[in-house]
């Protein structure tokens, strides 16, 4: 009996363990299903915080509360998620009849409008950010010359008769030191420098020509760009705590206080653009404290360059400037934001001397520029987000897009935005939305250097579809963690050693050192890439990537290089062209021998752990030797790009054709998960309900500028579209024509009593009296379907493919444009039998109308929208003479000379087609 009892007890325990295991497995399966279902639900109905924002320019500022409310309501209705308020220059003189009154920046009336805009936006569920200044960079009337951006000025005075006369000083200038050197002002020998009295006088005669060098603490005298009325003044000294403290007190505090108990989501610092600033009053003392020696005796070397010692001094000067902008500009702004229950959003690049590690200070890094295959401010910002665990990277998007203003199309928007997504962006800040009151006329106001995305734009009716696409992709690219494989070590210490007076930008130097060919080689090999710098490696203690590429580099801090050597035990280090051999600064030259020894151990000795390659042509093989491609592609792949996010139970691949020709490829994902789904990021549909991956790859055909989502997952899911239907695509399905609709249309212009018959498709600018028309034109016709439609077949309206063209602009042309003349110029909304079937704003110009078409007679209506350029081309150029007389020349309209109407309308051919799944 005792044995039986023990036996039954053991059986009970075994059953309990089994039940627990089953319950655990069911729970895990539920979690996996829940995770996948949550991902799909978020994709179909993304949350509001992923919607694109708009930079909202207040010109003047000449704003009124009724117009502010109207524009905010319009934005909300268009799917725009928030605004960044940026007051800028006036565009009209005060005109009571037109309701134009330019307020003074920071006046009580202006601040009351800021408060009203914030309250109204919040009531609409919109986010509100604000620039802590007007125009850019920070500065204004409160910035005295003493607090203005500084620069090191050098006056070269020939020594005549053993005597030198000091130069006259401008207001605010101060002599730092004076030296006499052998040679002329352009070719002197810094090694011969002898210090002389600041006041000049007799000098010791030397053999040959002599020159006196007077080093002067001066100012750039740069003024704020594009300021509002009352915001004019000097750009502040970004290296000086006193300067930013004054700005925070006099400018930022009143602005933020206007928000009351609803603080701005973030406060914003635009791209620095403090040109030529390389000095501040406290620099000599700060330099000696941080670098351990006196800079002043080395000023002739700093100026002359050309020696190892001079480069080391220049490095130390640059590093000190970087320290000062981090400590005296970025940190105070971050602390100010936190103290006011906000966040600091910053474009931390450009002039002056910020480094990648400085991106760790702002809570919200922001980039700019769609340079996907070359060094990019945007990849700079997203790399920092990935390194410092910031899940959201924003980007100023569409700056200079297809200039001039009003020329940009929805296709242009998508072409640039998709590159931003590939660069790691997942929050779009559109550039931008001009405040434009009725008194401004049509098509309203615009910024000199930007596209226009407000309701004065004729194609604005399709904006909700555009913003939904941006919202959907932005949200999806916030899920999980970034999965970029490759880190490029930025040679920032070499960049600082290359600084010269007036030129102290790390990011400008990176353009010379991170070649587009290197970026292209990495991307074409099937990987994605981030940047990293030595300071970040030192801070993190390791490199959170499988592969580190060291491009040609001379200098590196020893502590960081030791960590790289340690990382090489598990990660892969590839040096390209030249491995480091030097300590960075003058007081670190003693580390050079050990740095060179590490390079030898990594790349030369018999048991070396790293790889050394001599040319960019070897990059692909070196990477493939290190790890398999994340996305392996064959076929016609020019312009194909991707970005990968990794989740616990799935991998997300956002795949884009960035070019104007069709991609037709076979792709293989490195992920070893067995199942895959294909999602349409535009319509929110699951295109392929699920398939097993067998290693043979997936067929991929993308029209120009088309994008797609692949979700590689652990388990197959039921395929459900946004409308609740399963949608499956097969590669061998073919189109069968139901009807050719390339003729027989009627067109109706607003104001016409009756539509007119259109025999052939083409530009409406060729029609009588329509050359300068901008707006909506309605195309309509009937189509008879003479047979019953096949169950499960997909019926589509195909509007054609358009015509590609080459970019014939100069290489340095500003802004981006899509290199395709589409068959729909520039956007359209399609109705079938009175129901909205969808919109057309990018390739493929094709709409699934399966649920709207039926056997028998069907009515098709296409509402087509062009750009406002045609309207502008028919108007006289705007005369800003009186405006400039009052306010000065604060802007110049870009590319507005000799405007010509742009082809508009439907071009076809148009077909109604049926695709039967086989």
Give the role of each language-model region.
Residues 4-22:
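Bacterial N-terminal signal peptides that target proteins for export
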Residues 21-30:
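Bacterial N-terminal signal peptides
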Residues 39-82:
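Mature N-terminal segment immediately following signal peptide/propeptide cleavage
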Residues 52-53, 64, 68-69, 82, ...:
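Carbohydrate-binding surfaces of carbohydrate-active enzymes
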Residues 88-198, 205-207, 214-225, 229-236:
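Acidic/aromatic-lined carbohydrate-recognition and catalytic surfaces
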Residues 136-146, 150-153, 158-165, 169-192, ...:
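An acidic-aromatic loop/edge-strand motif
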Residues 177-180, 184-256, 691-738, 855-857:
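Extended acidic/polar, glycine-enriched regions
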Residues 831-838:
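Short strand-turn-strand beta-turns centered on an Asx-Gly dipeptide
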């Amino acid at each position: 009996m005792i044995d039986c009892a023990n036996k039954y007890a053991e059986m009970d325990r075994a059953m309990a363990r089994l039940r627990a295991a089953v319950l655990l497995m069911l729970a895990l399966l539920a979690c996996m299903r829940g995770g996948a279902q949550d991902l799909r639900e978020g994709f179909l109905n993304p949350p509001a915080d992923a919607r694109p924002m708009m930079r909202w320019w207040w010109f003047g500022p000449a704003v009124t509360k009724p117009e502010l409310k109207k524009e905010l309501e319009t934005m909300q209705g268009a799917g725009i998620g928030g605004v960044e308020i940026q007051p800028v220059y006036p565009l009209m003189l005060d005109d009571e009849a037109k309701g134009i009154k330019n307020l003074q920046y920071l006046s009580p009336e202006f601040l009351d409008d800021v408060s009203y805009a914030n309250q109204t936006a919040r009531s609409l569920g919109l986010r509100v950010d604000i620039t802590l200044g007007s125009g850019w960079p920070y500065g204004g009337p409160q910035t005295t010359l003493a607090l203005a951006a500084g620069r090191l000025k050098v006056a070269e005075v020939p020594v005549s008769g053993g005597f030198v006369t000091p130069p006259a000083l401008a207001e605010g200038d101060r002599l730092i030191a004076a030296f006499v050197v052998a040679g002329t002002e352009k070719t002197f020998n810094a090694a011969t420098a002898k210090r002389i009295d600041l006041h000049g006088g007799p000098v010791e005669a030397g053999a040959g020509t002599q020159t006196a060098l007077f080093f002067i603490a001066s100012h750039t005298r740069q003024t704020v760009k594009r300021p509002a009325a009352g915001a004019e003044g000097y750009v502040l000294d970004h290296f000086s705590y006193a300067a930013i403290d004054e700005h925070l007190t006099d400018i930022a505090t009143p602005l933020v206080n206007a928000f009351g108990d609803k603080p701005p989501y973030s406060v914003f610092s635009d791209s620095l653009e403090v040109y030529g600033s390389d000095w501040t009053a406290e620099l000599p003392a700060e330099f000696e404290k941080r670098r351990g020696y006196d800079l002043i005796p080395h000023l002739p070397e700093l100026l002359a360059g050309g020696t190892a010692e001079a480069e080391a001094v220049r490095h130390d000067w640059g590093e000190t400037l970087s320290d000062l902008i981090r400590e005296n500009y970025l940190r105070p702004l971050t602390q100010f934001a936190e103290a006011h229950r906000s966040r600091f959003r910053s474009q931390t690049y450009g002039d002056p001397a910020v480094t990648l590690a400085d991106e760790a200070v702002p809570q919200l890094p922001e980039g700019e520029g769609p340079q996907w295959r070359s060094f990019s401010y945007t990849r700079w910002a997203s790399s920092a987000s990935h390194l410092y665990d910031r899940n959201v990277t924003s980007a100023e998007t569409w700056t200079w897009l297809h200039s001039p203003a009003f020329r940009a199309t929805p296709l242009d928007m998508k072409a640039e935005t998709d590159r931003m997504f590939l660069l790691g962006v997942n929050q779009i800040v559109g550039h931008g939305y001009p405040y434009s009151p009725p008194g401004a006329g049509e098509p309203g106001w615009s910024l000199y250097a930007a596209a226009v995305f407000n309701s004065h734009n004729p194609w604005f009716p399709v904006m909700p579809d555009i913003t939904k696409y941006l919202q959907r992709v932005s949200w999806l690219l916030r899920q999980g963690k970034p999965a970029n494989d490759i880190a490029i070590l930025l040679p920032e210490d070499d960049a600082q050693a290359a600084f010269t007076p007036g030129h102290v930008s790390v990011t400008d130097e990176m353009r010379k050192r991170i070649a587009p060919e290197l970026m292209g080689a990495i991307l074409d090999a099937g990987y994605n890439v981030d940047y990293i710098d030595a300071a970040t490696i030192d801070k993190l203690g390791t490199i959170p990537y499988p592969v580190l590429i060291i491009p040609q580099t001379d200098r590196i801090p020893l502590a960081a290089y030791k960590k790289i050597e340690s990382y090489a035990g598990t990660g892969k280090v590839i040096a390209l062209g030249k491995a480091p051999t030097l300590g960075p600064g003058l007081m670190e030259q003693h580390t050079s021998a050990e740095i060179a020894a590490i390079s030898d151990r990594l790349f030369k000795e018999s048991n070396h752990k790293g790889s050394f390659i001599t040319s960019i042509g070897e990059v692909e093989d070196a990477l493939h030797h290190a790890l398999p491609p994340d996305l392996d592609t064959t076929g016609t792949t020019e312009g194909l790009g991707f970005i990968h996010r990794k989740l616990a139970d799935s991998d997300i691949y956002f795949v884009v054709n960035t070019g104007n020709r069709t991609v037709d490829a076979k792709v293989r994902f490195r992920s070893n998960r067995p199942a895959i789904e294909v999602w349409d990021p535009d319509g929110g549909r699951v295109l392929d309900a699920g398939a097993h991956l067998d290693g043979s790859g997936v067929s991929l055909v993308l029209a120009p500028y088309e994008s797609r989502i692949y979700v590689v997952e652990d388990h197959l899911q039921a395929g459900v579209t946004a409308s609740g239907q399963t949608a499956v695509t097969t590669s061998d399905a073919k189109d069968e024509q139901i009807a050719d609709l390339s003729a027989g249309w009627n067109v109706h212009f607003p104001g016409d009593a009756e539509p007119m018959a259109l025999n052939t498709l083409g530009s409406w600018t060729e029609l009588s009296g329509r050359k300068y028309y901008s707006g909506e034109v309605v195309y309509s016709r009937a189509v008879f379907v003479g047979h019953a439609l096949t169950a499960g077949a997909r019926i589509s309206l195909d509007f054609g493919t358009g015509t590609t063209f080459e970019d014939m602009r100069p290489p340095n042309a500003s802004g981006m444009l899509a290199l395709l003349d589409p068959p729909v110029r520039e956007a359209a909304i399609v109705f079938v039998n009175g129901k909205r079937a969808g919109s057309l704003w990018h390739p493929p110009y094709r709409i699934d109308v399966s649920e709207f078409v039926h056997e028998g007679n069907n009515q098709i209506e296409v509402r087509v929208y062009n750009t406002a350029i045609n309207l502008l081309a028919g108007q006289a150029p705007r005369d800003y003479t009186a405006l400039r007389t009052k306010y000065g020349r604060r802007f110049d309209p870009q590319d507005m000379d000799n405007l010509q109407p742009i082809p508009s309308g439907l071009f076809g051919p148009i077909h109604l087609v049926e695709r039967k799944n086989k």
